[in-house]
From Swiss-Prot:
Protein name: Nitrous-oxide reductase
Top-level class of the enzyme under EC nomenclature: oxidoreductase
GO function terms (MF aspect): calcium ion binding; copper ion binding; cytochrome-c oxidase activity; nitrous-oxide reductase activity
Binding sites annotated in the UniProt record for Cu cation A1: 589, 624, 628, 635
Residue numbers binding Cu cation Z2: 138, 187
Family listed: Belongs to the NosZ family. In the C-terminal section; belongs to the cytochrome c oxidase subunit 2 family.
Source species of the chain: Cupriavidus necator (strain ATCC 17699 / DSM 428 / KCTC 22496 / NCIMB 10442 / H16 / Stanier 337)
Biological processes, Gene Ontology terms: denitrification pathway
Entry-linked PROSITE patterns: COX2_CUA, TAT
Signal peptide segment: 1-46
Gene name in the database record: nosZ
Length: 643
């Protein structure tokens, strides 16, 4: 891989604006990262960009984010929750949080991790306790049809325990979770957009997952980082089973997929395969690894794979040594500068963009040239790079407006830069008069992920853009040491970007998607027959004993439970089943048992169950925790446990 030096230019603005992190970050890299401005003009001056913050006073000049009472948002947003382990549903442009979807960690409001049904999804030990109770969700993405979202599913990763959760977008609930084998630090995630071979399959059937942390394969307690490897994983979108994995050189970070289904890719910040801070930054160029999906699946079909440990998942060899011949290669490593932190697919279906992080550059890779290399028609793989241009300090993630412009966050500069892809390509070819930077906007502060309305689809509409700022500092009322993060909304419908709103959010969201509300068709009342344990008539209620195992069947219709009381014996193993027979939307019922650590909800026509041991004798008032009626306080029943 090329080790060419990437010159690092100075971003616009003075040191004061980036002093909080910029100075510390650059000082921390002294002696590790060679940072120099020799041979490189300042990024803003090189492209004739407007001065940093020149129109920061335009705050509020864009379209209004205020909605009148009863007025609905025009877009949904799906946000990762970070180490709250959930997915969050927002309405845009208002920025109002509508729902939190529990996924990987318990949630006391809905009883996630308490009910038997949720434990089955989350994964439990033989004794009924959860396998994991912490998580770190980073990236959310949704299923596609014909290059646009189809409203079926969304997915989110858990970086801590290498799990992927699927969300049904009809009910906005998590219905499946899969743990990836032989992977640590599962970070990037992206669904495919169509099948690479069968043109009739114009929708998502695979979800690709990147393993960030190299580990010994098979697992072993070795300190030799040279033996650590990372795997790129394919999960079946319907069954959620792991289809196959690819062994690679270096690591995986984020993931992107092409619109024709032929390619997936992951950017790499640790091609050195280093275990320590300085080792991971020693190379001046890292890579974006492309995966030829059809060839990988043909290799699996032909039995050209191995397995690791107890896993039966086929693993093909995607290392550079095993893929030197382009015409048979499964992978292709395009070099990019230095420690890139993001790869994003442009809505015109032509390019992948890698942001440099430790380089002030963004790299534009033309997909047709990558495919040309796989076909033996492109002699040098790095000739797929059609632009590599300076944007500013700390470029991380990129969004698109569908008009040929890209929007990249600059972490150290605390800016969003709007730049034109065609102009960047012209500049890279030698036209130094091409002004590729269109606009800059100061953000508050240290922006990370960014996305725009419909940005990652063929229907990118260039109206709104959201950015997740990792530090809020002075933007909100102080609440002690733990600050909220700052999610900012920006109007990108005009030539100039306009900051519209700040929103404090509980830490720590990462990535998100924004899509038109008409693309989903939510159901607000369940189908009773979808639940095998459903109690369809209150007359079916009762206590049913089989030795020391007892089943209690109860229905609820506001404002009463079907059983006024029920009796148990100390030591009974109890499974309590509750069905909400109300058919009106928003009539959700709760069920709590004091001293037994039980609380859960049932939505209209939903059935849920809990299992516990009646180990405390006495009278316990089970009551409805979710307000549903004027006689809400009277909605209770007695559980009597006899000694």
């Amino acid at each position: 891989m090329s080790k060419e030096k990437a010159s690092i230019g100075n971003g616009p603005g003075g040191i004061g604006r980036r002093q909080f992190l910029g100075t510390a970050a650059l000082a921390g890299l002294a002696g590790v990262v060679a940072c120099t401005d020799k041979g490189a003009a300042p990024a803003a001056a090189a492209v004739g960009a407007p001065a940093s913050g020149a129109h920061g006073a335009a705050h509020g000049a864009g379209a209004s984010v205020h909605l009148k009472p009863g007025e609905l948002d025009t877009y949904y947003g799906l946000w990762s929750g970070g180490h709250t382990g959930d997915m969050r549903v927002l309405g845009l442009p208002s920025g109002r949080e509508i729902l939190r979807i529990p996924c990987f960690v318990p949630d006391a409001l809905v009883g996630w991790g308490i009910t038997n049904e949720s434990k089955k999804v989350m994964g439990a030990r033989p004794d009924g306790t959860l396998r994991y109770t912490v998580a770190d969700t980073h990236h959310t993405h949704a299923s596609y049809k014909d290059g646009n979202y189809d409203g079926r599913y969304a997915w989110v990763n858990d970086k801590i325990n290498s799990r992927i959760a699927r969300i049904r977008l009809d009910y906005f609930i998590c219905d499946k979770i899969t743990e990836l084998p032989n992977v640590q630090g599962f970070h990037g995630i992206f669904p495919d957009k169509r099948d690479p071979v069968d043109t009739k399959i114009n929708y998502t059937t695979r979800v690709f997952c990147g393993g960030e942390f190299g580990i010994p394969l098979p697992s072993a307690p070795t300190e030799d980082a040279g033996k650590y490897r990372s795997l790129f994983t394919c999960v079946d979108a319907e069954t959620m089973a792991v289809r196959w994995q690819v062994l690679i050189d270096g690591n995986c970070d984020l993931v992107a997929t092409s619109y024709d289904g032929k390619l997936a890719a992951t950017n790499q910040y640790n091609t050195e395969n280093g275990a320590h801070f300085e080792d991971m930054m020693s190379a001046e160029r890292d890579a974006c690894v492309f995966f030829n999906i059809a060839r990988i699946e043909a290799a699996v079909q032909a039995g050209k794979f191995k397995t690791y440990g107890d896993s039966k998942v086929p693993v093909v060899d995607g290392t550079q040594a095993a893929n030197k011949d382009p015409k048979t290669a499964l992978t292709a490593y395009v070099s990019v500068p230095k420690n890139p932190h993001g790869v994003n697919a442009s809505p015109d279906q032509k390019y992948f963009i890698c942001a440099g992080k430790l380089s002030p550059t963004a790299t534009v890779i033309e997909l047709s040239r990558v495919l040309g290399w796989f076909d033996g028609k492109q002699e040098k793989l790095d000739d797929a790079i059609v632009a590599e241009v300076e944007l500013g300090l700390g470029p991380l993630h990129t969004a698109f407006d569908g008009r040929g412009n890209a929007y990249t966050t600059l972490f150290l500069d605390s800016q969003l830069v709007k730049w034109n892809l065609d102009a960047a390509i012209k500049f890279h070819k030698g036209d130094k008069n091409a002004k590729y930077v269109v606009d800059r906007l100061d953000l508050q502060y240290q922006p990370g992920h960014v996305n725009a309305s419909q940005s990652e689809t063929v229907a990118a509409d260039g109206k709104y853009l959201a950015v997740g700022c990792k530090f809020s500092k002075d933007r909100f009322l102080p609440v002690g040491p733990l600050h909220p993060e700052n999610e900012q909304l920006i109007d990108i419908s005009g030539q100039k970007m306009v900051l519209m709103a700040d929103h404090p959010v509980r830490g720590e969201p990462h990535d998100f998607i924004i899509f038109k509300r008409e693309l989903v068709r939510p159901k607000q009342v369940y189908a009773l027959d979808d639940f095998p344990l459903a109690i369809k008539d209150p007359k079916e209620s009762g206590v049913f004993r089989n030795g020391r195992k007892v089943t209690v069947k109860i229905t609820s219709q506001a404002p009463a439970f079907s059983l006024r009381e029920f009796k148990l014996k100390k030591g009974d193993e109890v499974t309590l089943i509750l069905t909400n027979l109300d058919k009106i939307e928003d009539l959700t019922h709760g069920f709590a048992i004091p001293k037994y650590n039980v609380n859960f909800i049932v939505n209209p026509q939903e059935t849920a169950s809990v299992t516990f041991v009646a180990d405390k004798p006495g009278v316990f008032w089970c009551y409805c925790t979710h307000f549903c009626h004027a006689l809400h306080l009277e909605m209770r029943t007695r559980m009597i446990v006899e000694a």
